[in-house]
Amino acid sequence: DGEDIAKYSGETASYTISLQDDRVTVEDRRGGIDGIDALTDIETLSFLDQEIDLSLISSATELSDESMGQLVEYYIALTNRAPDAFGLLFWASAAADGLSDREIVESFFEQPEVQESFGDLKDLEGVVRNAYERVLGREVDEGGLDFWTPLLEEGKVELSQFVLELIQGVKAAIPADESQAFRDQKEADAAYLADKKELGLYFAVTKGMSDVEDATAVMEAYDGTEASLEAAKDLIDEVYAAASTGDGDLLIELVGVVEDPFAA
């Protein structure tokens, strides 16, 4: 069989693509010039400025909400911004097709954007400090620095897997003999991760946005407080209002996998 292509008269910035189950909906936001198409068995969407290969993202509809949330956490931790919709759906599709978390994180870490953001990768103590700031929003405590730095130096934790290990450590069960201060910090770290995950899901999945500058600004607006969470959410709504106009930005929404994290 030949490749099935759906062709459109405008550039991608004027369209919203929605993925749900095995269906793709394409909406022209320019006042109905191309209308709304409900598509099945289409491999490629062809616009004036580019073609979109749906096979790269279509399996994302099969990922569980829990796995999508974990992927968003890794994405934010490694890029230091909210996910872009297409990139997130690409990795979500790969995960649904069998790529493991460790393989995804390793592939992420090889990207120049990620490596440059961590600074000097030979300064392992600096990498640990950087990771705590970007993943947990705080300075590393002495115990954390003394725990992780030797593991990296001795190769017991691979550099590419450190962020994954750090996130999993936050979620791990608390030993019975740990202090209340340790418990309180662990709960605060988990809450910080959860808030950033909600913002990432809202930006990339619920709203389907991909502008990297906006994705960076959203995470910069959040500092761990409830007020900043609301401010970051409001910023997403603001940029979405501009992006969803007839000449805004390409939006790629994933429907039915995760709930709107800010739904009343």
Predicted regions: what is each one?
Residues 43-264:
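Substrate/cofactor-recognition hotspot
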Residues 1-64, 128-130, 135:
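Acidic, glycine-rich low-complexity repeat segments characteristic
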